[in-house]
Every structure is written in C-alpha cells, then in structure tokens.
C-alpha cells in the first residue's frame, strides 16, 4: 500500500486539483491522508465534498484538536499511515500522470528506500514555467548541504528500508531539509529519479518564496541543527546559494 500524506492549510483554491492529480495515479492500493491544520477558509468543506463524490478513493480527512504546523501535520499523517510506502505532496502542488508508478518501479529496481524526482516550477494557476529542476542519481550528506535539491512533494519512503521512527519532521524552519540531512547522516541512501514528475506551484503563500528567509533558514540549519563549523558552513552556503540561483534561472 502507498500512503500519501497531504498537509492542508487554507488551500480551498488548490486542493481539488491536487487531489485530482493523486486519484488519477491509478494506484489500486492507496490511502490519502489529508491533515487539516485549522484552516480558516473552506478547505475542509471542499475536501468533504470531494470525498463524498469519490467514495472509493481512499481519502481520509484528519482534523486534529490543536494547531500542528506543516511538520506536525506530516508527522501525524506518518503515524496514522498504514502503507509500506509513504509519499508526500503539499496541498497546492501537483503530480504528473503515472508519477507513483514510475517512482515505485525505480525504487524497486535500485533497492532504494528514500527516493526523490525532478520537478518543474509552475505559476499560481499551475501553468508550467518551463524550468525543470534536474536531480542526481544519488545524493550524499555532503552534497545535500551544498544543493538541497530534494523537494518534499517528490519524496517517497519505503518503510521496509527506512525505519518509520526515523521519518520525523523536526519542529524548526526548513523542517523538510532538516529531515533529509538527518536521514543522510544516519547512512540512508537517497536515490534521484531524473524525470519531471511534479509541478511545484509558486503561490503568494509559499513559505519558501522569500529568498532572504530561505537563506537565513539554511544558514541556521548549518549552525544550529547540523552544528557545522564556521568554515564548513560558509563553504556549504556558497554552494547552496549558487545552486539555488541556478534552479530558478
């Protein structure tokens, strides 16, 4: 079984298209866990309408009592998941046709428990912007420090290889990048499928849209989370900055 985890917060304009991109994957044994983080718009109503019109889709809406933020929403989804494979998709991003089939076959071929794919930037209307981010066949911890090319909405874990208790998003800024660093430090192998299989929708609410904030977050990860020395932090940061610009040119 594949468990797809989708954190939701005020995504009434986007969540239907995201769900369409999941249900059109054609995976028979799949559950979709939508974790709403106290949305103040009509996201919950839109989701409930979608579930009612797609009764056999395996979609389940989880509404926790308190506010969790993206990290907590994903962690709750992980705890609730029943599948061998855990996939992530943000509630405003989209998967390409057959994304799951291609990636699962790739993971089986490579014997890999942690995989990610290429992706393309899209505008707020989900129109592709023609900029595809290529990914390496494998990525090490040292390489990830300089080029955080792993995009959350492309990631799948095989929990028979990567321990479920190791898949925990920390409650810090850039929690996804922090998790990739943690797993790579522990020796898990991350494999990249260099196919454009996801659309990364750039909305006004994108947490990572502010370049200065992104730079500040990655620097704080180096120094406070990874405890890198100052020289290694500077070296990694220069590489990160170069690659971040290149991804957007």
Regions found by a protein language model. Name each.
Residues 86:
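Short aromatic/hydrophobic "clamp" motif used to bind/position activated sugar donors
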Residues 1-2, 23-34, 42, 56-60:
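Short loop->beta transition adjacent to catalytic acidic/histidine clusters or analogous donor-positioning motifs
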Residues 21, 36-45, 66, 90:
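A conserved acidic beta->alpha catalytic loop
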Residues 6, 79, 135-213, 217:
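Conserved nucleotide-sugar donor-binding catalytic segment
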Residues 11-24:
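Short, well-formed alpha-helical segments that are part of the catalytic scaffolds
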Residues 64-81, 102:
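Glycine-rich, basic loop-to-helix element that forms the pyrophosphate-binding segment
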Residues 14-16, 41-50, 94, 98:
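Acidic helix N-cap motif at the loop->helix transition within catalytic regions
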Residues 98-129:
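Conserved donor NDP-sugar-binding/catalytic core segment of glycosyltransferases
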């Amino acid at each position: 079984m594949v468990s797809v985890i989708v954190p939701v917060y005020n995504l009434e304009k986007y969540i239907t298209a995201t769900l369409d991109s999941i249900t059109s994957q054609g995976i028979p044994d799949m559950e979709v866990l939508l974790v709403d983080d106290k949305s103040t718009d009509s996201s919950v109503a839109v989701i409930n309408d979608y579930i009612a019109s797609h009764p056999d889709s395996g979609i389940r809406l989880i509404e926790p009592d308190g506010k969790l933020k993206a990290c907590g929403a994903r962690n709750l989804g992980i705890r609730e998941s029943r599948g061998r494979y855990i996939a992530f998709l943000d509630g405003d991003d989209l998967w390409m046709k057959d994304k799951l089939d291609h990636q699962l076959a790739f993971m089986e071929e490579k014997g890999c428990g942690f995989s990610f794919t290429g992706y393309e930037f899209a505008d707020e209307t989900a129109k592709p912007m023609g900029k595809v981010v290529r990914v390496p066949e494998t990525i090490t911890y040292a390489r990830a420090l300089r080029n955080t090319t792993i995009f959350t909405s492309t990631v799948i874990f095989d929990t028979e290889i990567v321990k479920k208790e190791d898949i925990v998003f920390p409650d810090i800024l850039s929690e996804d990048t922090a998790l990739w660093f943690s797993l790579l430090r522990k020796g898990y192998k991350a494999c990249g499928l260099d196919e454009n299989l996801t659309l990364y929708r750039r909305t006004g609410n994108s947490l990572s849209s502010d370049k200065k904030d992104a730079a500040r977050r990655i620097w704080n990860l180096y120094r406070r989370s990874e405890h890198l020395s100052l020289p290694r932090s500077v070296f990694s940061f220069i590489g990160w900055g170069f690659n971040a610009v290149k991804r957007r040119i």
